């Protein structure tokens, strides 16, 4: 039949119309998406190292007379302590901090990664 809309498409189109405006029923709603049983509970180790040490330095200011900032207690590379950002920003920051002391091959690989990420962030994503 020319000009007719298939049944499934018409059902989808009527899905946009509120049920109060419809003059007929679309049938019994499907129960395919209704979960009949509860999912099994996840087994979680509540005392792993990360959870056990959570908030351990929260009161460092009170007990330490406010001489140290918690970011000074973080162990890791100097260019990452107390700093947040995406991978491109992290690589640029690493190059700025230790680029002159890196081996040639490592610096070359870092420059390649920065080049790739720069192209990627400019071609993909929400803010391009």
Curated annotation (Swiss-Prot):
Its main location: mitochondrion. The keyword Ribonucleoprotein applies. Component of the mitochondrial ribosome large subunit (39S) which comprises a 16S rRNA and about 50 distinct proteins. Interacts with OXA1L. PANTHER family: LARGE RIBOSOMAL SUBUNIT PROTEIN ML51, MITOCHONDRIAL 39S RIBOSOMAL PROTEIN L51. One of its GO terms (biological process) is translation. Belongs to the mitochondrion-specific ribosomal protein mL51 family. This is Large ribosomal subunit protein mL51. Keywords: Mitochondrion, Ribonucleoprotein, Ribosomal protein, Transit peptide. Pfam families: MRP-L51. Residues 1-31 form a transit peptide. It comes from the Eukaryota. GO terms for molecular function: structural constituent of ribosome. GO terms for cellular component: mitochondrial inner membrane; mitochondrial large ribosomal subunit; mitochondrial ribosome; mitochondrion. The gene is Mrpl51. It is found in: Mitochondrion.
């Amino acid at each position: 039949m020319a000009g007719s809309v298939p049944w499934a498409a018409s059902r989808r189109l009527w899905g946009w119309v509120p049920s109060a405006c419809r003059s007929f029923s679309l049938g019994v709603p499907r129960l395919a998406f209704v979960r009949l049983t509860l999912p099994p509970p996840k087994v979680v180790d509540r005392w792993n190292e990360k959870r056990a040490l959570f908030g351990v330095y929260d009161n460092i200011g009170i007990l330490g007379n406010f001489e140290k900032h918690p970011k000074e207690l973080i162990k890791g590379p100097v260019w990452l302590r107390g700093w947040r950002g995406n991978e491109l920003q992290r690589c640029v920051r690493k190059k700025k901090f230790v680029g002159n002391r890196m081996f040639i091959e490592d610096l070359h690989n870092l420059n390649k990664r920065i080049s790739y990420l720069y192209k990627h962030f400019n071609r993909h994503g929400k803010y391009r």
